[in-house]
Amino acid sequence: MKMTFRWYGDTDPVPLAYIRQIPGMVGVVSAIYDVPVGEVWPIDRIRSLKEKIEAHGLTLEVIESVPVHEDIKLGKPTRDTLIVNYGQTLRNLGACGVKVVCYNFMPVFDWTRTSLEMPLPDGSTTLAFDTQAIRELDVSEGIQLPGWDASYRPEQLKALLRDYEALDEAGLWANLDYFLRAIIPVAKEAGIKMAIHPDDPPRPIFGLPRIVKNRADLQRVLDIVDDPANGLTLCSGSLGADLQNDIPALVREFGARGRIHFAHLRNVQTNAAGDFHETSHRSADGSLDMAEIVKAYFETGFEGYARPDHGRMIWGETGRAGYGLFDRALGAVYLNGIWEGLAKHPADHAAE
């Protein structure tokens, strides 16, 4: 398991020098954030980013993400040109040594939360999702949430939502099918493994279809193009927001088949209504057994990339919600510690 850390470029409050100091940290996960969605990432920009990261003793082998344009998700006539551009970006990334590209197929909105600073009893703050609050939001009035790859003006958002009114889950599946059949051969040629990120949260929101929510959906994605280049970002926190998803079982099934290319490891406290908040990575603090999840990766021989995903804001830190240094660093060390214990004493855990 190669431990990595998300970095948002020069505007990120967390400097590369600090990331390098996290024990066991080998790489950075990043992207080029100022190229408009749908345009080709220039190879010189990719090289520059890679050189900057490597100068701090870290690798750039995972990109998160190359956003998929809404016209591709909607199946508009412009999608063919956009897919060609996407493929050229993959070729440029592959030429620079990138191995994995994380992406998602969520309509309009990326990961969604209703609070960025929910207070916890210990004084830290965290990201939270309240189902009722989402139901009461009027997205047509224009809202901006973290994690989006684009910020829409109210009129743009209204137009997009109108476009999606005519698209159900079957239509979105058809458009994902079209995209993957076109792009996976290009990715394979470029030496890149595509890794789809599950929907976060794993259910429809704002009346929009969501199709990567559970085991059946993950299997269906892989069946579209049955090739190792078509794989998964298995996000424990996203899928774990649905109590019906057995995360260790998913890791064992898809990991044993070599189809998990990127592991997002975080814990969430979830209730039956679908409300959740993010916790520390420690198993006891959330609904997920993180030790068992890491054990599943270990037992399936996982050699891919992992990151501690989101973290709380602790010790007075300010910055990008969910992406501070301190709690994610603690998470990385905790996860690597579980792995080291399994590696040094495998017989102690074999019968558990």
Swiss-Prot record:
The keyword Lyase applies. Its EC number is 4.2.1.8. Pathway: Carbohydrate metabolism; pentose and glucuronate interconversion. InterPro entries: Man_deHydtase, Xyl_isomerase-like_sf. It holds the Pfam family UxuA. It comes from the Bacteria. It catalyses: D-mannonate = 2-dehydro-3-deoxy-D-gluconate + H2O. Keywords: Iron, Lyase, Manganese. One of its GO terms (biological process) is D-glucuronate catabolic process. Its cofactor is Fe(2+); Mn(2+). One of its GO terms (molecular function) is manganese ion binding. Catalyzes the dehydration of D-mannonate. NCBIfam families: PRK03906.1 (NF003027), uxuA (TIGR00695). Belongs to the mannonate dehydratase family. This is Mannonate dehydratase.
